Amino acid sequence: MKLFATIGVLLVALLAFFVQPAQAEPDAEITHKVYFDIKQGEESLGKIVMGLYGDVVPKTVENFRALCTGETGKGYKGSKFHRVIKNFMIQGGDFTRGDGTGGESIYGRKFPDENFQLKHTKPYKLSMANAGRDTNGSQFFITTVVTSWLDGKHVVFGEVLEGQDIVDAIENAPTGARSNPKVDITIADAGEIPVEKSETKEAEPAKEDAKEPKEDVKKKGKSDKDEL
């Protein structure tokens, strides 16, 4: 009888250990808004408006914001989305080489991972591309599905507020062997938009039925020189 009681206690303890509540994400308020005007070849696709979480990752947000305005003499205007993978993400921000091997931050060529408090929990999240730990520069990506395997590896710092259809259009653009769009997709203009006080709460998920892509999609188009 004592043996069964002991086994029961152990089972309860194990269950309590494995069924612990997940640590909740901090409330992410939108502190800054920025935009991209997008062109595909000579055709205007429209505007993407993004909200940034400056209270959670202020250094990462300031880097992206300043590169949108170009106030430091360098920035995203004129650069292109060099890597597009359907059911995964769209990647840009390499304004020095344009192929995923360049880019630089406002702090120098690279800067450390600020924190990983925010997760890739839904489509249209804005996150830093990198080539490994503490190698953030200017390259970024926008998710088009849930990408939870990137949690703890890439710094989430914002989300798309308007222009999700533009992101979808970029995601579905024809691509070459290295996942680069066959027709250049460029950031024709970029800048900052004033934030109203009523806009400081994180936006609702844009796609309720989003699913994670299959494992083979996660590595498609990846090379040793690519940042993600």
Swiss-Prot record:
Its main location: endoplasmic reticulum. One of its GO terms (biological process) is protein folding. Glycans are attached at N136. It catalyses: [protein]-peptidylproline (omega=180) = [protein]-peptidylproline (omega=0). It is found in: Endoplasmic reticulum lumen. Pfam families: Pro_isomerase. The keyword Glycoprotein applies. Keywords: Endoplasmic reticulum, Glycoprotein, Isomerase, Rotamase, Signal. This is Peptidyl-prolyl cis-trans isomerase B. It comes from Yarrowia lipolytica (strain CLIB 122 / E 150) (Yeast). The gene is CPR2.
